[in-house]
């Protein structure tokens, strides 16, 4: 690893021996595992901390051959990846994927445009408008912020009284994302979700996430177990990847009471340390294989 630097206007575009920029702000378990894999393969990389990076778009020349984004701030991720692409770099994941998957409504629209089965959604441009329409949409339902992870600020709306209390609270919050009210039908799932990992158009593996709570995120204590990748599931996952774009994706799916499978969300900077506990550490190597294949095409 080379020492991190602040991008400067005087830097030159990197050639095939130049380092890969690893965009980040925190080094979590996933980033550490990927960097250890790069070290093992003697891959040159440079840590690019989004909290200190400064760019000059009018004189942008960067000393990298490509970039891997593992940034956890959605806003910084969106703008940094666009700047890196403006400099002519291939970025995994791309600005388009990060912009789309980082916004639940944009993800839903992309899925619907490709005919991917996804839960019914209603969008109110104000919380009050959403509340007025919910009786027709139907209860129970789920409201989520447009951006965010780990199920934070998501709420299950059992009835009108619950919705009134939750949406009144949302209306008092500042920020545009709290005013745009994204409501999804509640899927009565069998105590579990599915998370599947797709690198490019290859399904790497899938896990069930079991929980007694309606939110099954492993970060919230969801228990992972191996999920068999059936031909039907693989077909759905590949179609989802084609709809979103080629990259490193974690696809969250819900099983309905009649056996239907819905794509719920698509994650662009996925955590995977819980998955490798059941799928094995080979996932890290395949992640690195995919990134290097995109950045160093032969």
Predicted regions and their residues:
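Phosphate-binding site of ATP-dependent enzymes
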Residues: 156-244
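Glycine-rich phosphate/pyrophosphate-binding beta-alpha loops
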Residues: 267-280
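ATP-binding N-terminal substructure of ATP-dependent carboxylate-amine bond-forming enzymes
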Residues: 1-97, 296
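Short amphipathic alpha-helical segments and helix-helix/interface helices
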Residues: 31-35, 80-82, 108, 131, ...
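A long amphipathic alpha-helix within ATP-dependent nucleotide-binding catalytic cores
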Residues: 215-263, 285-298
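Protein kinase-like catalytic core scaffold
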Residues: 141, 182, 204-205, 249, ...
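Active-site nucleotide/adenylate-binding loops and adjacent lid/helix of ATP-dependent enzymes
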Residues: 2-4, 14-17, 24, 60, ...
């Amino acid at each position: 690893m080379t020492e991190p630097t602040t991008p400067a206007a005087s830097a030159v575009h990197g050639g095939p021996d130049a380092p890969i920029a690893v965009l980040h702000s925190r080094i979590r378990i996933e980033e550490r595992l990927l960097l250890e894999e790069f070290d093992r393969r003697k891959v040159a990389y440079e840590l690019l901390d989004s909290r200190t990076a400064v760019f000059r778009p009018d004189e942008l020349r960067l000393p990298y051959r490509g970039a891997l984004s593992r940034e956890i701030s959605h806003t910084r991720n969106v703008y940094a990846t666009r700047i890196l692409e403006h400099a002519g770099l291939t970025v995994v994941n791309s600005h388009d994927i990060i912009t789309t998957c980082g916004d639940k409504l944009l993800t839903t629209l992309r899925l619907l445009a490709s005919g991917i089965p996804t839960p019914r959604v209603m969008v109110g441009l104000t919380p009050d408008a959403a509340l007025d329409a919910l009786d027709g949409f139907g209860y129970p339902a789920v409201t989520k912020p447009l951006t965010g992870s780990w199920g934070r600020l998501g709420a299950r709306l059992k009835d009108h009284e619950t919705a009134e209390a939750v949406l009144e609270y949302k209306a008092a919050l500042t920020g545009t994302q709290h005013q745009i009210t994204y409501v999804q039908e509640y899927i009565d799932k069998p105590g579990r979700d599915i998370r599947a990992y797709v690198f490019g158009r290859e399904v790497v593996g899938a896990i069930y996430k079991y929980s007694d709570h309606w939110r099954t995120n492993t970060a919230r204590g969801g228990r992972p177990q191996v999920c068999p990748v059936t031909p039907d599931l693989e077909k759905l996952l590949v179609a989802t990847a084609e709809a979103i774009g080629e990259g490193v994706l974690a696809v969250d799916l819900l099983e309905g009471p009649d056996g239907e499978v819905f794509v719920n969300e698509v994650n662009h900077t996925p955590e995977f340390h819980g998955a490798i506990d059941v799928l094995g550490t080979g996932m890290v190597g395949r992640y690195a294989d995919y990134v290097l294949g995109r950045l160093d095409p032969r």
